[in-house]
Regions:
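Rossmann-fold NAD(P)-dependent oxidoreductase module
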Residues: 17, 104, 108, 157, ...
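Rossmann-like dinucleotide/phosphate-binding beta-alpha-beta segment
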Residues: 134-207
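Short gly/ser/thr-rich secondary-structure transition/capping motifs
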Residues: 25-34, 47-52, 125-132, 183-184, ...
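Short, conserved catalytic or adaptor-binding loops enriched in Gly and charged residues
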Residues: 18-21, 81-85, 188-195
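Short beta->alpha connector loops
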Residues: 9-12, 31-34, 50-56, 71-75, ...
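Short amphipathic alpha-helix with an adjacent loop that forms part of the alpha/beta core around
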Residues: 37-41, 59-61, 205-207
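N-terminal glycine-/charge-rich "phosphate-binding" loop or analogous flexible N-terminal tail
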Residues: 1-47, 177-182, 186
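Phosphate/diphosphate ligand-binding glycine-rich loop within oxidoreductases
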Residues: 44-124, 138-142
Length: 207
């Protein structure tokens, strides 16, 4: 049996789904959503699902640990840590947030273009204002230009959605010569080949 320790505050039904992945897994839970790893607490787990850097055990207390999957996308803060320079496999959730964040960005753009905050303002006041045609007349997105600084998984999903509204998309990334996305991307989302944006500039060009 492979021991798996989950330090996220997952509900019982989700923990059951994790356990059901394989009969060879022995899954346990230690909720560290509101605290760091308990001092002196040892574990024999081989796989750890962790909320973040502060939720990790000292390596001398986790002699069997072989793989840590992080709940978050960014783990750069671990670069100077003991575990970063060990043989333990470290993986993150980078890429999974693109559909939700892309949807959120487009929701804000559409709210701005359609004067939604203005609608709500007058609705809450129970007022039908003078000059309302000028106040409520929406802007059309088609033909406008959207700039995206950082063409990672989220930026690429924003680009994909923006093109559906007829926007011209200009993006920037650190290395504009390598336009492909080499990380995980939710199937059907984003721009894995780097062909959706109308133009991709090097990051220095955005300064």
């Amino acid at each position: 049996m492979t021991e798996v320790l989950v330090t996220a505050s997952f509900p019982a039904d989700l923990m059951a789904r994790i356990s059901a992945v394989s009969h060879s897994l022995e899954v346990a839970q230690l909720d560290l959503s509101r605290r760091d790893w308990p001092e002196g607490r040892a574990t024999t787990a081989e796989i750890l699902y962790s909320y973040g850097a502060g939720k990790l055990p000292p390596l001398d207390l986790a002699p069997n640990l072989r793989w840590v999957q992080f709940h978050t996308a960014g783990i750069n803060r671990l670069r100077e840590s003991e575990i970063w320079h060990s043989d333990i496999l470290l993986t993150s959730a980078s890429g999974i947030h693109a559909p939700n964040m892309g949807q959120y960005v487009m929701a804000q753009i559409l709210a701005w273009a359609n004067r939604t905050p203005t609608w709500f303002y007058y609705q809450q006041r129970g007022e039908w204002p003078a000059g309302r045609w000028d106040k409520f007349l929406p802007d059309e997105l088609r033909g406008r230009t959207l700039g995206i600084l950082g063409y990672g998984s989220i930026g690429r999903e924003v680009a994909r959605l923006a093109k559906a509204f007829g926007l011209t998309v200009l993006a920037s990334k650190r290395d504009a010569r390598d336009v492909k996305d080499h990380g995980y991307m939710v199937p059907g989302a984003g721009d894995p080949k780097g062909v959706t944006a109308d133009r991709i500039y090097p990051g220095a060009a955005a300064r």
